Amino acid sequence: MLMVMILRFAPALVCLCWIAMAADSKILVHGHRGARAVMPENSLPAFEYAIQAGVDVLELDMAVTKDDVLVVSHDPEMNPAYCAGPANAKTKVIREMTLAELKQWDCGAKANPGFPKQKAIPGTRVPTLDEVFALAPRGKFDFNIETKIFPQRPSVTPTPERFAELVLAQIRKHKLERRVILQSFDFRTLRAMRNLAPEIRLSALLAFPQQDWIQSCKDSGATIVSPNVKLVTPEKVAAAHAAGLTVVPWTANEATEWKMLVAAQVDAIISDDPAALIAYLQHSR
């Protein structure tokens, strides 16, 4: 009799368990360039703000100086819209500057005009990856770090293989093998890292609708697919999950986008305003 009752109610029990698991699952928050909406992007103040806000992951971009130092910057050149350089600066290209020359630039002197809430913090310098990794003891957050590679401009970055070697050296130095995700639109650095250190998690960044999520991860060796938020549908997310992939869209800053991504059951969200996203997710539970 007991067995009959168990079999009779098994479908309902499975459904209830699935609902409970879905309710308990947490969508992780990645602070895009730290917290670009409110602080100078890719800066120590932005990362410190994001840590205080309670992010799960610090997201950032990397460039390489003339003397082969990894620094945190989205662009291969210094952007005069919010970075002020010395009067005698000979170049704006990071790869053509030594670290000492790069540190003369002030990237907090002017707020980014694209983000009205962003606070200017004069004296903010471009941090090295070493300096950002030194924040690791401040919490249990991970790092999602992007190799900025420009195939049409090979002179502004090292080779993909050299880039991966430099990144791995910093990961090893800080013993962060379990806390770092390497992401890129250029899969050459992902494949290079897979060959050097298969234990490092890899994320395939996707920007175009014609890119197949699952095939892109097969091609790059990634277990994380990171599409533009506009490419996300529940069906694509479900297919990625069925293939064993984690889905981490970028860059979502509006409540309407967050609602859509939650409904699509993504695993994490990359946002310029991580504090607002965290508050939204807490309120919507």
Show the residue positions of the predicted features.
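N-terminal secretory signal peptides that target proteins for export/translocation
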Residues: 1-6
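Alpha-helical interaction segments
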Residues: 7-8, 240
